Each structure stands twice: as structure tokens, then as C-alpha cells.
């Protein structure tokens, strides 16, 4: 075949061929990133299912030292799988703090039961209805002491404090609450896990803004769709609250349902 004919044949339908190839690639990526991980998470959840969640273990997970007057200030963020089928893809987050000289911890949750902001209703590092909590953020000493009044003020100023404000999806829920506190406290460079459904709900209703850690920018459509790029958060894509992404700072991949796979993201301050 002459060279000219070969070029003519190659030029006949390249756009459609390339478009078809792109569609297949996008479809494969969608299945691998957004469908397979939740399916695997569902399988794992069924094997470790807690049947009677109302009577499930809520005892201390042993993640906090005893609260003694002589111990320094402490700030912690924990996250644990939620109850029933929602635990396949979602976690519940909360904040714990102790001032220097205090003999007890204070725990702040945001729930669907009654007035949503709950204080000291659960054991500070307790299992969440049988599910082991994960440490998300830790600060101690003078840095924690600096954060504590800012955290308390952020709780008082939270935009959704009333009965009926809670919405499991896309927010505001417990993860929205904790993300808002992170955003309100300078230096609290924490990133909630990708399974923290609701963390991307914009309480200020803005489409563009800083990430909660203040180290990046995010584009957000009501918590349903969005993209975030930040030094602490890494690169994240939010599709109907299913979050996938990568973390370069502490190498890991983030997948819906499965969560973060890689080096721990827990920073200490």
C-alpha cells in the first residue's frame, strides 16, 4: 500500500476511535475506583457485622492516657465506622480535649439524636457501637492548650446546632462538624479519612474555598461533587460523597468504602 493511502486510511476515523478509547478508559477507572472498593468493603462488613448494635461494646479502646491533673493538655480527633449498613462506606468522627491541670476529658459529638451537639455523652475514646476508633489527629502540651479555647469557640459558633439540622447525607453530620472545627482552628492540620462522608459539605455554601486544613483549595457543589487539592488533604475527588484520591505528603491512596491505604496520616502537634 502506498504511503499516501496509509496516511489517508489512518486519518479516516481517528477522532471517534480515540473518543471510544477514552470512554472505555473512563468507564474502567470509574468501576475500579468508585464501584469495586465499596463492593469489597461490603464483603468485609458482612463478615464482621454487629447484629445487635444497640447493645454493642462502647467501652474505652485504650487510646488515651488517664486524665490526671499533672498531665499536659491534649487534643484528639477520632473516627470509627458507623452502625448498621452505613458502616460499609461511612465513619463517625468526634473531638476529645483536656486542658492542662484538668482531671477529665471532654468529648464533642454531632449526632442525629435530639439536639445534635452532644458533650460527654460517650467515653472519650470509646468504641463506636462495637467499632474500633482510628486516631486522626493528635496535639499535646502548649500547642494543644492553644487550640482548646478555639475549639470550644468553634463548637459554640457552629452553624447547625439545632434539632433537625442533622442530615446523614450529604451533611451536615458528624464529619461536617469536625471538619468545620478543623477549619476554625489555625494550625490544626488534620485531614479526615475518605470514609468520613459529609466532611466536604460546605457550611458556608461557597463553591470555592480553602480546604479544612487551610493548606489547599477545593471546588465544591453542595457536598455532592467536588475536587480538593491540598498539602494535608492531598488530591481528592468527591462523587456523591464517595471520595477517592492520593496523598503525596504521606504516600497513600484513598478509596470509597476501604478508606486510606498507605502510610498513616495522623499528624502530631
PLM regions with names:
Residues 96-97, 155, 182-185:
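Hydrophobic, Leu/Ile/Phe/Ala-enriched alpha-helical segments that form helix-helix packing faces
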Residues 11-60, 159-269:
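Activation targets extended, charge/polar-rich intrinsically disordered C-terminal tails
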Residues 140-159:
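A structural motif
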Residues 2-8:
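N-terminal intrinsically disordered, acidic low-complexity segments at the extreme N-terminus
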Residues 92, 146, 150, 173-180:
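Extracytoplasmic/secreted proteins, especially bacterial periplasmic and envelope-associated proteins
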Amino acid at each position: 500500500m502506498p504511503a499516501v493511502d496509509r496516511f489517508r486510511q489512518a486519518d479516516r476515523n481517528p477522532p471517534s476511535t480515540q473518543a471510544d478509547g477514552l470512554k472505555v478508559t473512563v468507564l474502567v477507572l470509574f468501576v475500579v475506583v468508585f464501584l469495586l472498593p465499596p463492593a469489597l468493603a461490603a464483603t468485609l462488613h458482612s463478615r464482621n457485622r454487629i447484629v445487635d448494635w444497640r447493645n454493642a461494646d462502647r467501652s474505652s479502646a485504650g487510646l488515651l492516657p488517664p486524665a490526671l491533673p499533672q498531665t499536659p493538655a491534649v487534643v484528639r480527633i477520632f473516627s470509627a465506622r458507623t452502625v448498621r449498613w452505613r458502616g460499609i462506606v461511612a465513619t463517625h468522627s468526634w473531638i476529645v480535649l483536656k486542658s492542662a491541670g484538668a482531671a477529665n476529658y471532654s468529648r464533642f459529638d454531632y449526632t442525629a439524636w435530639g439536639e445534635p451537639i452532644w458533650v460527654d455523652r460517650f467515653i472519650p475514646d470509646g468504641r463506636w457501637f462495637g467499632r474500633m476508633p482510628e486516631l486522626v489527629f493528635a496535639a499535646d502540651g502548649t500547642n494543644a492548650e492553644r487550640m482548646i479555647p478555639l475549639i470550644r469557640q468553634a463548637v459554640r459558633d457552629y452553624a447547625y446546632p439545632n434539632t433537625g439540622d442533622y442530615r446523614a447525607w450529604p451533611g451536615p453530620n458528624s464529619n461536617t462538624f469536625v471538619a468545620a472545627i478543623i477549619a476554625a482552628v489555625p494550625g490544626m492540620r488534620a485531614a479526615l479519612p475518605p470514609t468520613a462522608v459529609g466532611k466536604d459539605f460546605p457550611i458556608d455554601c461557597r463553591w470555592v474555598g480553602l480546604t479544612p486544613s487551610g493548606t489547599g483549595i477545593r471546588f465544591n457543589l453542595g457536598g455532592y461533587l467536588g475536587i480538593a487539592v491540598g498539602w494535608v488533604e492531598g488530591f481528592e475527588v468527591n462523587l456523591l460523597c464517595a471520595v477517592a484520591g492520593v496523598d503525596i505528603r504521606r504516600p497513600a491512596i484513598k478509596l470509597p468504602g476501604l478508606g486510606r491505604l498507605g502510610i498513616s496520616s495522623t499528624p502530631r502537634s
